[in-house]
Amino acid sequence: MALGVLIAVCLLFKAMKAALSEEAEVIPPSTAQQSNWTFNNTEADYIEEPVALKFSHPCLEDHNSYCINGACAFHHELKQAICRCFTGYTGQRCEHLTLTSYAVDSYEKYIAIGIGVGLLISAFLAVFYCYIRKRCINLKSPYIICSGGSPL
């Protein structure tokens, strides 16, 4: 048993070492599938930029005042200036201020919670009272204790 575990650990270690090494062998697809595959031999020289950087660049000087509350960027595919709004602003030109609103908790909510908890406790106490009362009635002995008086 211990020998099997030792062999399994050694095989796992060798597999991990081969997978992590840069000299791992790449096996090409079978000859039947090779005609449909194309290989890129310059994978190490190719660096792909993020997609977001390909589409927009900073605006020209004539568009600098286009965005009211944000940074201007020029989208090459749309061929127009777009705005990246600062926090709290929205709109095509960042012209709308998003107001943060705060709701004040009303006392009605707390009153409703208090009434609900009170009803729940009352129901629990009523069930407990009924259970204790039924138990006390069942504890009474069904036999009558006679004290040596008259015979039956």
UniProtKB/Swiss-Prot annotation:
Residues 131-152 are cytoplasmic. Expressed at low levels in testis, heart and liver. It is a single-pass type I membrane protein. Residues 1-18 form the signal peptide. Glycans are attached at residues 36, 40. One of its GO terms (cellular component) is plasma membrane. Disulfide bonds join 59-72, 67-83, 85-94. One of its GO terms (biological process) is positive regulation of mitotic nuclear division. Residues 19-109 are extracellular. It comes from the Eukaryota. Residues 55-95 form the EGF-like domain. InterPro entries: EGF-like_dom (IPR000742). GO terms for molecular function: epidermal growth factor receptor binding; growth factor activity; receptor ligand activity; transmembrane receptor protein tyrosine kinase activator activity. It is found in: Membrane. The chain crosses the membrane at residues 110-130. Keywords: Disulfide bond, EGF-like domain, Glycoprotein, Growth factor, Membrane, Signal, Transmembrane, Transmembrane helix. Promotes the growth of epithelial cells. May stimulate the phosphorylation of EGFR and mitogen-activated protein kinases. PANTHER family: EPIGEN (PTHR10740:SF10), TRANSFORMING GROWTH FACTOR ALPHA (PTHR10740). This is Epigen.
